């Protein structure tokens, strides 16, 4: 964890907003830069379709390994990340599968697959990330058990685990992980050794981490020595 409460983070964001160091957005903050526009500190302001174009090859490799873990009759959680969306697009062909997600684009893409039942989490709709945030659906999440939670993150480190820029989305993912038998992190090599605002899972919460073959040998050895079960896609 970052060692500070959500209240402290919100207070600091308010103060920086007043000082014109950034612009507050729902669940996060944006960097004030007249030359480049108002982009959030970790890129969260990018629209979903823009994020989907980044590291496409790596995401496809990761999703190709993740799909091997999915079986009929499972109930799985997929977050609103573009990597989870790539995984979701590989679910055609399943005849009996339940998918819980906070990703609007993913839900719309899966709704016409006959063998897939889609459940959207309750919450507030965000425009840029095309996701649903918040815990209005907390009671629902407490009642549903998932076999695997597939999650991505803005950053991943040994000290802070999986981190996200949105406090609200981190809260939702934290709840989903608690109700899942297994957590599988889908993290491309660019996310390693970086940290965003809100931690939602420690390294001990992760049963398997799938990354791409762009991860350096040194970084791979460091994380494996720390007990992380790494699956390198594309090796």
Positions of predicted regions on the chain:
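HTH-adjacent hinge/linker in prokaryotic transcriptional regulators
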Residues: 1-3, 7-8, 13-77, 89, ...
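Conserved phosphate- and dinucleotide-binding cores of soluble alpha/beta proteins
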Residues: 3-5, 18, 24, 107-235
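Short, flexible active-site-adjacent loop segments at beta-strand->alpha-helix junctions, enriched
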Residues: 35, 82, 103, 124, ...
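Residues at secondary-structure transition points
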Residues: 53-57, 61, 82, 94, ...
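Structural motif
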Residues: 79, 100-102, 121, 186
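Short glycine/serine/threonine-rich phosphate/pyrophosphate-binding segments
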Residues: 84-87, 194-195
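A residue-level structural signature of the nucleotidyltransferase/glycosyltransferase Rossmann-like core
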Residues: 98-99, 148
């Amino acid at each position: 964890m970052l060692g500070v409460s959500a209240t402290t983070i919100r207070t600091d964001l308010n103060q920086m907003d007043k000082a014109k160091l950034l612009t507050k957005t729902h669940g996060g903050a944006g960097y004030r830069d007249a030359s480049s526009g108002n982009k959030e500190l970790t890129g969260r302001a990018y629209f979903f379709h823009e994020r989907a174009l980044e590291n496409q090859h790596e995401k496809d490799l990761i999703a190709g390994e993740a799909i091997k873990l999915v079986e009929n009759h499972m109930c799985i959680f997929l977050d609103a990340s573009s990597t989870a969306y790539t995984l979701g697009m590989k679910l055609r062909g399943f005849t009996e599968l339940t998918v819980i997600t906070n990703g609007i684009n993913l839900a719309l893409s899966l709704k016409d697959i006959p063998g897939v039942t889609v459940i959207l989490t309750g919450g507030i709709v965000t425009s840029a990330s095309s996701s649903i945030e918040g815990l209005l659906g907390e009671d629902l999440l407490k009642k549903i058990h998932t076999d695997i939670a597939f999650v991505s993150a803005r950053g991943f480190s040994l000290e802070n685990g999986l981190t996200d820029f949105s406090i609200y989305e981190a809260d939702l993912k934290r709840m989903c992980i608690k109700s899942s038998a297994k957590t599988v992190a889908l993290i491309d090599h660019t996310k390693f050794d970086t940290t965003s605002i809100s931690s939602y899972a420690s390294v001990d919460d992760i049963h398997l981490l799938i990354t791409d073959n762009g991860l350096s040998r040194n970084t791979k050895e460091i994380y494996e020595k720390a007990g992380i079960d790494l699956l390198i896609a594309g090796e």
